[in-house]
């Protein structure tokens, strides 16, 4: 559970509208604060706008508002477009407005391929601060990293150890690195 994760020291919590757990995340955050485990400011909470809310700016605004309401939070530390689908340019305008209003402290994208990210960054008013992508020792994505570097977009890895598909704990090279550090 999220509350137990906070109890053990986790401070970054990643959720999304499509995960259908924003309400549970918000509840765990409120419980952790009530128990004196942390302050809201000590946590970094990310959520994501799903594609059904990316048809236009109005739907994206409603999606952001719904995420905030479900979670019971006043703001998200980071809010992402979950994928480059739908009218993600119009949806981005809603993120820009919420960022400027302070309800989204940082805004970014997720799963944007290098050519999509490049076109996006050349077009939008506020560049994404993060691109959350699959990134791990078995899928290094050098072209994606180069595009992010060029546009000053911070990469954030999902499945940073390979998502369990690659058995990284049995990988001799990774075990050697772990043992050395």
Describe these PLM feature segments:
Residues 1-43, 61, 161:
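N-terminal binding-site loop/beta-alpha segment at the start of enzyme catalytic domains
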Residues 1-6, 55-71, 88-90, 115-119, ...:
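Short, acidic/polar
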Residues 13, 76, 107:
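Glycine-centered flexible beta-alpha turn that most often forms the glycine-rich phosphate-binding loop
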Residues 7, 40, 73-74, 104, ...:
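Active-site acidic short loop of glycosyltransferases
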Residues 83-181:
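Beta/alpha (TIM)-barrel catalytic core signal, keyed to glycine-rich beta->alpha loops juxtaposed to Asp/Glu
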């Amino acid at each position: 559970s999220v509350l137990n994760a906070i109890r053990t020291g986790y401070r970054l919590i990643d959720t999304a509208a499509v995960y259908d757990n924003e309400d549970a995340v918000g509840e765990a955050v409120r419980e952790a604060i009530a128990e004196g485990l942390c302050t809201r400011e000590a946590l970094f909470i990310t959520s994501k706008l799903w594609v059904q809310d990316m048809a236009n700016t109005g739907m994206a605004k409603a999606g952001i508002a719904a995420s905030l309401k479900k979670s019971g939070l006043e703001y998200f530390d980071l809010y992402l477009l979950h994928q480059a689908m739908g009218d993600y340019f119009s949806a981005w305008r809603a993120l820009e407005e919420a960022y400027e209003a302070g309800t989204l402290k940082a805004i970014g994208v997720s799963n944007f391929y290098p050519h999509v990210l490049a076109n996006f960054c050349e077009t939008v008013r506020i560049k994404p601060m993060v691109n959350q992508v699959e990134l791990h020792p078995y899928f290094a994505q050098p072209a994606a990293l180069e595009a992010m570097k060029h546009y000053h977009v911070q990469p954030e890895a999902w499945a940073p150890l390979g998502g369990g598909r690659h058995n990284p704990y049995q990988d001799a090279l990774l075990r050697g690195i772990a043992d050395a550090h």
